[in-house]
């Protein structure tokens, strides 16, 4: 059976307001999936249903083709967006306790806790109370709590929130270690540039419905704009008068522009070559931010 976590046609309403509408996507083993959407789009509700914190009105969540039960969910790692830590409890003591709740012996939980705190740069503060930590360091503790039992699946709600650039790099390294070990990782984030850099697959949700999902390459190809970039030896200002060209940006010899459907990019390239050397010319790959705006507006 393929190691895939599948969300299939999940819907959920609160009172008369439907917040999820037939949400469907896969999280594949060994791949990192970014879950992006505006505030209130349905990301957290979806994750809570995946972990059994909330029940779906309809639809299913399966792992390796089987419905999730309590025993299966104990093998998942989950980091909620809200702080779920005991403020007056020691860092290591807290993670050890949570590891035991997932079935680890105290010795195993202690060993794994100290290894994780070392990896996350918190080993020297293992006995401090959580309330003494910065928000960013509390975030690291929450990640350690999600990882301590070596989960089969990892679901993280805004794991990069409040982290400085160095802490982000550490977190990225930890998540990549998990995917390299074959773990499917799903995380939500508002940092689209980070998601684009880090993730293999993307899921975009808006108003409780999935607007786009697939691999990073597939989405870029599917939502590619008729946009090109050119760099010539001299000034590229002549593009202003070229038929079918709409300038997006122009900076001396470099320009980014859109082509109308009737325009011929090869004819334009020949025109550029007639005017002098062309250092580069080609289509511009859309960014995740551009794809996000296109599918959610």
PLM feature segments, named:
Residues 4-5, 12-206, 212:
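ABC transporter nucleotide-binding domains
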Residues 72, 223, 296:
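Short, flexible helix/strand-to-coil boundary loops that buttress conserved ligand/catalytic motifs
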Residues 260-297:
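C-terminal coupling/interaction segments
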């Amino acid at each position: 059976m393929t190691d895939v976590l599948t969300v299939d046609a999940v819907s959920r309403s609160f009172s008369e307001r439907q917040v999820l509408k037939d949400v469907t996507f896969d999280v594949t083993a060994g791949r990192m999936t970014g879950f992006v959407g505006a505030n209130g789009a349905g990301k957290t509700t979806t994750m809570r249903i995946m972990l059994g914190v909330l029940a779906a009105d309809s639809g299913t969540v399966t792992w390796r083709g089987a419905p999730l039960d309590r025993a299966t969910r104990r093998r998942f790692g989950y980091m909620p967006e809200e702080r779920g830590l005991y403020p007056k409890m020691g860092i290591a003591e807290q993670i050890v306790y949570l590891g035991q709740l997932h079935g680890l012996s105290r010795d195993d939980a202690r060993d794994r806790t100290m290894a994780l705190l070392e990896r996350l740069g918190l080993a020297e503060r293992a006995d401090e109370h959580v309330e003494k930590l910065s928000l960013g360091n509390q975030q690291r503790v929450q990640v350690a709590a999600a990882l301590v039992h070596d989960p089969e699946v990892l679901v993280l709600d805004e794991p990069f929130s409040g982290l400085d650039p160095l802490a982000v790099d550490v977190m990225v390294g930890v998540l990549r270690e998990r995917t390299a070990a074959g773990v499917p990782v799903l995380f939500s984030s508002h940092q689209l540039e980070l998601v684009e850099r880090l993730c293999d697959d993307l899921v975009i949700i808006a108003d409780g419905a999935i607007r786009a999902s697939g691999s990073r390459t597939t989405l870029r190809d599917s939502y590619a704009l008729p946009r090109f970039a050119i760099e010539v030896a001299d000034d590229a200002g002549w593009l202003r008068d070229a038929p079918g060209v709409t300038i997006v940006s122009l900076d001396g010899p470099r320009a980014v522009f859109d082509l109308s459907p009737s325009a011929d990019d090869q004819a334009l390239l020949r025109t550029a070559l007639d005017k002098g050397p062309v250092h580069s010319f080609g289509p511009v790959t859309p960014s995740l931010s551009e794809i996000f705006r296109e599918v959610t507006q």
